[in-house]
């Protein structure tokens, strides 16, 4: 056994070092992207909660269907749109449908923070598709971007990725 692919659990590195000391530990690309997807989902849920709170502060309508001349409720529309954006944010860009592309374009216009979180997730995902030398540079650039992004879920993710940087790069090599 020359390589061991695993997630970032600390106990795995201890067992591998103990049982197979010459093996190279590699971070499974799926799990690293899963960390980014979980961080993105935290940002999406917080954006939805913020939009829902704004929607609750809008004036209430009466019973029944709204009148044709009723004022629009933009915060309610925003909350509903963010709530229904989960799959568009999770999928790989090459697998998106036309409606999901439109949803991402809408997110880019209405919630820049959520869109930035999506771009961070996709940036980390693309690192695994690069040649090793390019991946080293791209990972360092991504770490800098994630540390400075002012999105708590991604600054926390940046600390985890930095901790497992060598293991992640072993998977690319």
Q: Which residues make up each language-model segment?
A:
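Short alpha-helix plus adjacent loop in nuclease-associated cores
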Residues: 29-53
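Acidic/histidine-rich catalytic cores and adjacent linkers
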Residues: 2-21, 30-33, 53-173
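Conserved beta-strand segments of alpha/beta enzyme cores
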Residues: 24-26
